[in-house]
Curated annotation (Swiss-Prot):
Chain residue ranges for the region called Disordered: 236-257
Subunit structure: Interacts with GNB5, forming the RGS7-GNB5 complex. Interacts with GPR158; promotes the GTPase activator activity of the RGS7-GNB5 complex in absence of glycine, in contrast GTPase activator activity of the RGS7-GNB5 complex is inhibited in presence of glycine. Interacts with GPR179. Interacts with PKD1; this prevents rapid proteasomal degradation. Interacts with RGS7BP, leading to regulate the subcellular location of the heterodimer formed with GNB5. Interacts (phosphorylated form) with 14-3-3 protein YWHAQ. Interacts with SNAPIN. Interacts with GNAI1. Interacts with GNAO1, GNAI3 and GNAZ.
Entry comment on modification after translation: Palmitoylated.
Tissue: Brain-specific. Predominantly cerebellar granule cells.
The DEP domain, residue ranges: 37-112
CDD domains on file: DEP_RGS7-like, GGL, RGS_RGS7
Protein's membrane topology: Peripheral membrane protein
Keywords, alphabetical: Cell membrane, Cytoplasm, GTPase activation, Lipoprotein, Membrane, Palmitate, Phosphoprotein, Signal transduction inhibitor, Ubl conjugation
GO cellular component, one term: dendrite terminus
Protein name as it appears in the record: Regulator of G-protein signaling 7
Length: 477
């Protein structure tokens, strides 16, 4: 019967390349010794109530044989090895779909070599559907479908609805062939076929041992390929593995290679590393800081006028007076202040009051340059250069010599990022000096501490910039 089932198989060439083949060969050597007539596991026929169970042996027989013949001292190790072999389907319990080994009187049976995984079986879902359909045709308690098999059969019947008649006919033909076999032979072959499918379509929760590890497959295809880091250092971790095959000796590193290695390790020592606890604390602090600005978590203040009857938001926008919550956000960092148009305006006013606004004006001019059309970029680069960096510039900024020299070279070939280094230097200066003074200034503190006062703004007449929609909504109020 086993030979009559046409399950899909791969070619011999692919079989030899499979990373699992080494494991299969070792297991099959042990199985061959187990089946030896003189020194193997004794196989017997057990008499049960009104029936016989042919060609079986117990789980304790396997464990004892492994301990005796493979010089294994620990019974737990022998049980683990036997479980791995059972999971690959070389022997199986006759009354359980879970392929595991138990050190007791549970009966097991050897799998026929035709169904061994070394034959590289790749059975299709249609084959599985034929097998399950055939099981339903045989009115025997031992062939009843398990719950997960019944679910699989229903799913396959839906998937192959158009060709189900052909599947049913194939199952019916196989069932007729099975009926012509001897009773004992049929019982053995039925259990072996069931074990085959327990390997390739395992019980939910069990591991499919036929899957190929992509890392092992890659190593098998490139056995002599060495891994190198991006810095040119050879990764010799595999050389310490007990299963690694030594590669031919390589040339000793040259002086330049040693210098590169020293430089690489020095860079690694200087790298800034953070503990996961510090990263988690930083993330929690950021979340707590910005939680009140997330409308999904905290109701916005003022509320959305399109969702409520409160027009405070429109009134604040019309008055151009920033809310207390908005001003508070400027203190989180200089990026928050520069990102807000009102924040930029207040920051610029503060710097103008101290006669030091040239840094911020330069930074804003460079940001504007990045958004200009390409045809306007060369002329705008010259304007920025003449205003902030040229000798005798009216709003000269203070740059270090390195940034100034690089910017001078970049101006010869003007582009949107000509002043990138100068802008970064000015940004750091403002962040360390101008921005802290702005946050500590009385102007910012007054905006921050100002209490929101109730406003009695007359609804009529509407200002001339009021949209018709807004005018209509205020009339309704």
């Amino acid at each position: 019967m086993a030979q009559g089932n046409n399950y899909g198989q791969t070619s011999n060439g692919v079989a030899e390349e499979s990373p699992n083949m080494l494991v299969y060969r070792k297991m099959e050597d042990v199985i061959a010794r187990m089946q030896d007539e003189k020194n193997g596991i004794p196989i017997r026929t057990v008499k049960s109530f009104l029936s016989k169970i042919p060609s079986v042996f117990s789980g304790s027989d396997i464990v004892q044989w492994l301990i005796k013949n493979l010089t294994i001292e620990d019974p737990v190790e022998a049980l683990h090895l036997g479980t791995l072999m059972a999971a690959h389907g070389y022997f199986f319990p006759i009354s359980d779909h879970v392929l595991t080994l138990k050190d007791d009187g549970t009966f097991y049976r050897f799998q026929t070599p035709y169904f061994w995984p070394s034959n590289c079986w790749e059975p299709e879902n249609t084959d599985y559907a034929v097998y399950l359909c055939k099981r339903t045709m045989q009115n025997k308690a031992r062939l009843e479908l398990a719950d997960y098999e019944a679910e699989s059969l229903a799913r396959l019947q839906r998937a192959f609805a158009r060709k189900w008649e052909f599947i049913f006919m194939q199952a019916e033909a196989q069932a007729k062939v099975d009926k012509k076999r001897d009773k004992i032979e049929r019982k053995i072959l039925d259990s072996q076929e069931r074990a085959f499918w327990d390997v390739h379509r395992p019980v939910p929760g069990c591991v499919n041992t036929t899957e190929v590890d992509i890392k092992k497959s890659s190593r098998m295809r490139n056995p002599h390929k060495t891994r190198k880091s991006v810095y040119g250092l050879q990764n010799d971790i595999r050389s310490h593995s007990p299963t690694h095959t030594p590669t031919p000796e390589t040339k000793p590193p040259t002086e330049d290679e040693l210098h590169r290695q020293i430089k690489y390790w020095q860079i690694q020592l200087d790298r800034h590393r953070l503990k996961m606890s510090k990263v988690a604390d930083s993330l929690l602090s950021y979340t707590e800081q910005y939680v009140e600005y997330d409308p999904f978590l905290v109701p916005p203040d003022p509320s959305n006028p399109w969702l409520s009857d409160d027009t405070t938001f429109w009134e604040l926008e019309a008055s151009k007076e920033p809310s207390q919550q908005r001003v508070k956000r400027w203190g989180f960092g200089m990026d928050e202040a520069l990102k807000d148009p009102v924040g930029r305006e207040q920051f610029l006013k503060f710097l103008e009051s101290e006669f030091s606004s040239e840094n911020l004006r330069f930074w804003l001019a460079v940001e504007d340059l990045k958004k200009r059309p390409i045809r306007e970029v060369p002329s705008r680069v010259q304007e920025i250069w003449q205003e902030f960096l040229a000798p005798g510039a009216p709003s000269a900024i203070n740059l270090d010599s390195k940034s100034y020299d690089k910017t001078t070279q970049n101006v010869k070939e003007p582009g949107r990022y000509t002043f990138e280094d100068a802008q970064e230097h000015i940004y750091k200066l403002m962040k360390s000096d101008s921005y802290p003074r702005f946050i500590r200034s009385s102007a910012y503190q007054e905006l921050l501490q100002a209490k929101r006062k109730g406003r009695n703004i007359p609804i009529f007449p509407c200002h001339k910039n009021c949209t018709p929609t807004l005018r209509a909504s205020t009339n309704l109020l």
